Amino acid sequence: MALPKQRIRTGRRSNPPEPTQGIQSLVLRVLVYGAAICTFAVLLFLIGYILIRGIPYLTPDLFSLEYTSENCSMLPSIITTVEMTLLSLVIAIPVSVFTAVYLVEYAKKGNKLVGLMRLTTETLSGIPSIVYGLFGMLFFVTQLHWKLSLLSGSLTLSIMVLPLIMRSTEEALLAVPDLYREASFGLGAGRLRTVFRIVLPSAMPGILAGIILAVGRIVGETAALIYTAGTATELPSGLLSSGRTLAVHMYCLSSEGLHTDQAYATAVVLLLIVLAMNTISALIARKLTKN
């Protein structure tokens, strides 16, 4: 008679988890969830406080086309904010995107010029905004005789957001798999066609993320614009006319101490504009990702 086969266990028996590991996991989970809840609670508190203080003072007078000391209209500031944001992005986006394309797609690894450009970008991103404002005042306003104007402020803002968009674009391009490039080259496409037809569309969500951050910095900037664009309350008649953005308008109202309620109302509008821009950009990025 054949003896029944016995299973031979060659693997080692896993040791039961120690009690300290369970405690450490629980503590780590509590810390992670606690940090997330605190962050979300602070955000809700800030948004709720601004809305509660500002919504009751959103009157039709605040949206008059002409600013007076009585209505403290923010409509000229809204229009100036849109104009300055668009002009700054028109200047900054092509320069930053093409620079990032050169660094990732064309420059050789270990090139000293690439290292110098990245060092310059990191240095520019760490400079305080007041220094940018001082540079814009001395160069654009005084040296070029453009005075306090939309053009001076927009050029200063474009220099400020240039490192942000460039680094985001560079990271987005590096995230595109090399398989896409190799497949395009295998089909006979050149490098230029591959970059503009394959690489850039694949990296578009990351590029848009950098542009969103740049828009947020432009809309919320005050220090640099006070020195370059001025604080004029009327609508600018041209690129060489002075004007104030929403953030500068809110700063002026709050610093005077006479129109604090209108300053909170301006903060509500500024918050809604930023949320709307972020939502629209996120929807565009999601659509591009699906395509």
Task: Please name every model-derived segment.
Residues 89, 168-169, 191-228:
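Transmembrane alpha-helices
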Residues 122-158:
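Generic hydrophobic transmembrane alpha-helix motif, especially the helices
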Residues 88-121, 134, 282-287:
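Transmembrane-helix boundary motif in ABC transporter permease subunits
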Residues 79, 83-91, 95, 99, ...:
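Hydrophobic alpha-helical transmembrane segments of multipass integral membrane proteins
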Residues 128, 187-188, 201:
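Glycine/proline-centered hinge or cleavage motifs at structural transition points of membrane proteins
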